[in-house]
Amino acid sequence: VHLTPEEKNAVTALWGKVNVDEVGGEALGRLLVVYPWTQRFFDSFGDLSSPAAVMGNPKVKAHGKKVLGAFSDGLNHLDNLKGTFAQLSELHCDKLHVDPENFKLLGNVLVCVLAHHFGKEFTPQVQAAYQKVVAGVANALAHKYH
């Protein structure tokens, strides 16, 4: 991902304020509520029968935290996202058979959640930088599918 120094600073400055536990669970939960067909990848997570059940599900929260942990790692390796996400790409492609379009959806949901949490601080410039990052991460996660 090519970010200007200003974009990189904006991304890292905001990310330093992110509560990964909270935002991760909220982002994954929103993905499962807004795009219910994505729930098929989470059969083992128990009750996903309603928005309240999804958002309160401890397995959704735990996996969301794990997802954002990997995203955080990616932020430390923006120049090598494909390498950083190679194993996760292979896992999601070969073993889990996740539609790579879902990575884009999750990235966009993450941007919405960040906007919700940070309000005015999440300026259009910050959003533009995050859109580049989530697109780069989605592309890296889809790499093994090509």
Swiss-Prot record:
Q: Which residues carry this modification: Phosphoserine?
A: 44
Recorded superkingdom: Eukaryota
GO biological-process terms attached to the record: hydrogen peroxide catabolic process
Which residues are annotated with the PTM S-nitrosocysteine? 93
Q: Ranges for the Globin domain?
A: 2-146
Instruction: Using the record's annotations, give every residue carrying the modification N6-acetyllysine.
Output: 59, 82, 144
Q: Which InterPro entries does this one have?
A: Globin, Globin-like_sf, Globin/Proto, Hemoglobin_b, Hemoglobin_oxygen_transport
One of the record's GO molecular function terms = metal ion binding
Entry keywords, A to Z: Acetylation, Heme, Iron, Metal-binding, Oxygen transport, Phosphoprotein, S-nitrosylation, Transport
> Which tissues and organs express this gene's product?
Red blood cells.
Q: Enumerate the residues binding heme b.
A: 63, 92
Phosphothreonine modification, residue list: 12
Gene Ontology terms, cellular component aspect?
blood microparticle; haptoglobin-hemoglobin complex; hemoglobin complex
N-acetylvaline (modified residue): where? 1
Report quaternary structure and partners: Heterotetramer of two alpha chains and two beta chains.
Q: Which family does it belong to?
A: Belongs to the globin family.
The protein's role, per its UniProt record:
Involved in oxygen transport from the lung to the various peripheral tissues.
Protein name in UniProt: Hemoglobin subunit beta
Organism encoding this protein: Papio cynocephalus
Phylogenetic classification of the source organism? Eukaryota, Metazoa, Chordata, Craniata, Vertebrata
